[in-house]
Design a protein with these regions (language model features):
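Short, solvent-exposed loop/beta-turn-alpha elements that line the ligand-binding surface or hinge
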Residues: 156-167, 210, 247-269, 273-274, ...
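Long, aromatic- and glycine/proline-rich binding clefts that accommodate carbohydrate-like moieties
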Residues: 404-505, 509, 513, 535-553
Length: 553
């Protein structure tokens, strides 16, 4: 059920962190008084002679520091990190538009919280100690925590900017807190369910259509022989999270959950059926062969790639690697002649839908630098320059094309720096950027996949009610202890939490008996976390308390 953050980091794109002290000249027009934005495809009116020094910090990199990377001439063999290659390509293009703006880059190797290295929060602090200030834009692992620290600027001041208005509203809403826009969407992809159609057909298992129901999904899932292949690596509880109106949907819309209701109780009966057809249960029972474990290194995605699972619900970030025919020897390549990605199945309560993966970026709250919460003209100018780069980077077609055209070296193979990430904008700009996405060789296989076509429809119509854990108060810290807000629900597979194992006959009854208490405990945590965020919005930003009643997020 739980995803591996490390595997996700390997597929990250557009998740850099900008940090710098800036010296700015100009605030909307060039020296001749002519607005140059129409010429360069930007909409903020930032003068072309603006001077700034911007440092980028990102994870999943190479732990090298690149000063003024946009002025460098790096050969493909020197670019061994996809994220570094992406930032390099965008900085080069931005340099043509703003020759006096320097972009520097430090890219941490591995994950933000890579084992054996400082946590991402500590890296942020170290950045400040080394460079004299916090990053200006960073890939955030918790936007609400960054707001509580007073680090993130409110970007709603740009709400009239045309680029701001072009962002996908569903993505932007996850970063909006009572009107406070805490960041911008960066790496974003739809999250569906991988389906190994060829494996199913080889076992004489009928493959449902992409508009499948939860019962069709269950019949398909449980046709596994549980010896050589299974339904999935782990129990797909996310089917219930997305198949009710009172869990993920209610978190997104109201910021609360309701676990103790008929919707949830009726769907709990599916869990023991699913669990019995998972690799996790086979491993726990000692029936999973050693050879199969070694073959896939016990990793959920590799089990799917090696035809050991009919489905995979936990690893959405292999859109490129899974389909890259130029890297068939890669462990991440799907070794199946026919596969697809389906939406989540419908239930009696919700239609087919998708989850969403989004990595947000935040922009530094310059007003806090001098201890005065009010914005000076100089601080506003810094914010405008940083926001201009951030929007060019994440939203412009020019940046997407530059990334597509840029090459990097992946284990000796030369590849495009483009990857999984979807456009984070809408309208004609979205269509143009999806054309670029579709032109990547590894992505061309998707055009003929029926499930994928449904995924695209749901994405484009914003038919997802998923919340983003990096944007919501998914964890709470009290007295130095950090707890998962949804701890009991997310750990109901543990005997010590539920009172039984998922495959036990009485598991469902024991969980149902606990739902009321879990509901109370979880919502108390949510209430506390929400109050902490509200208090810090007022303390750090002089935020208007009256706005707390107009939005339940």
């Amino acid at each position: 059920m739980m995803k591996k953050f490390g595997r996700k980091a390997l597929a990250l794109s557009l998740t850099a962190v900008l940090g710098a002290s800036m010296v700015l000249t100009g605030c909307g027009e060039d020296k001749k008084g002519e607005d140059t934005t129409a010429k360069i495809g930007l909409t903020t009116g930032l003068a072309s002679d603006t001077t700034a020094d911007i440092s980028i910090m990102t994870w999943s990199g190479d732990s090298k520091y690149y000063e003024d990377i946009g002025s460098m001439d790096l050969s493909t063999d020197k670019l061994t990190s996809q994220n570094v290659a992406q930032v390099y390509s965008v900085a080069k293009q931005f340099k043509k538009l703003y020759p006096n703006i320097k972009i520097n880059l430090w890219a941490k190797t591995g994950d933000p919280d890579q084992p054996g290295t400082p946590k991402w929060e500590q890296e942020m602090t170290s950045f400040k100690a080394k460079y004299g200030k916090y990053p200006d834009i960073w890939a955030s692992t918790s936007v609400t925590n960054d707001i509580k620290k007073g680090l993130a600027a409110d970007l709603s001041v740009f709400k009239d900017d045309e680029t701001y208005k072009a962002y996908n509203k569903n993505l932007m809403s996850n970063l909006n807190y009572y009107g406070f826009q805490g960041g911008l969407p960066s790496f974003s992809i739809p999250w569906g369910i991988w389906v190994n159609k060829a494996l199913a057909e080889s076992k004489n298992i009928n493959v449902p259509d992409p508009d499948w129901t939860i019962d069709e999904y269950t019949r398909f899932f449980t046709k596994s022989d549980n010896t050589s292949f299974w339904g999935d690596k782990s129990t797909p509880v996310n089917i219930i999270n997305m198949g009710t109106t009172t869990i993920n949907k209610q978190i997104k819309e109201k910021g609360t959950v309701d676990l103790d209701n008929d919707e949830v109780k009726s769907l709990l009966s599916y869990i023991p059926k699913w669990a019995a057809s998972t690799i996790d249960v086979a491993e726990g029972a000692g029936t999973l062969s050693k050879d199969i474990k070694i073959e896939s290194k016990t990793y959920s995605w590799y089990y799917f790639c090696n035809n050991r699972c009919l489905t995979n619900i936990t690893d959405p970030w292999y859109l490129t690697a899974g389909a890259d025919e130029s890297a068939k020897e890669s462990e991440s390549y799907i070794d199946s002649k026919d596969w697809d990605i389906y939406p989540f199945p419908s239930t009696d309560y919700c239609g087919n839908t998708i989850k969403v993966v989004m990595d947000p970026i935040c922009i530094h709250n310059y007003a806090a630098d001098d201890g005065n919460k009010e914005w000076s003209d100089d601080e506003k100018a810094k914010l405008k320059a940083t926001y201009t780069f951030a929007t060019y980077w994440t939203a412009s077609t020019e940046a997407k094309q530059a990334i597509f055209d840029q090459k990097w070296t992946d284990n000796g193979a030369e590849k495009s720096a483009a990857g999984d990430s979807f456009p984070v904008v809408t309208g004609d700009t979205y269509n143009k950027q999806m054309d670029i996405w579709n032109n990547l060789p590894a992505h061309k296989t998707y055009k003929d996949k029926e499930g994928w076509k449904e995924i695209l429809k749901l994405w484009e119509n914003n038919e997802s009610w998923d919340y983003i854990d990096k944007c919501w108060t998914s964890k709470i810290t009290e007295k130095g202890e950090t707890t998962d807000v949804l701890y009991e629900w997310n750990n109901m597979w543990k005997e010590e939490v539920a009172g039984a194992w998922m495959t036990d006959k009485d598991w469902g009854d024991k969980v149902k008996a606990r739902l009321s208490d879990w509901n109370t405990t979880i919502n108390k945590r949510i209430e506390t976390a929400t109050k902490q965020l509200q208090d810090k919005l007022v303390e750090n930003y002089n935020f208007d308390k009256s706005k707390f009643t107009s939005d339940n997020k």
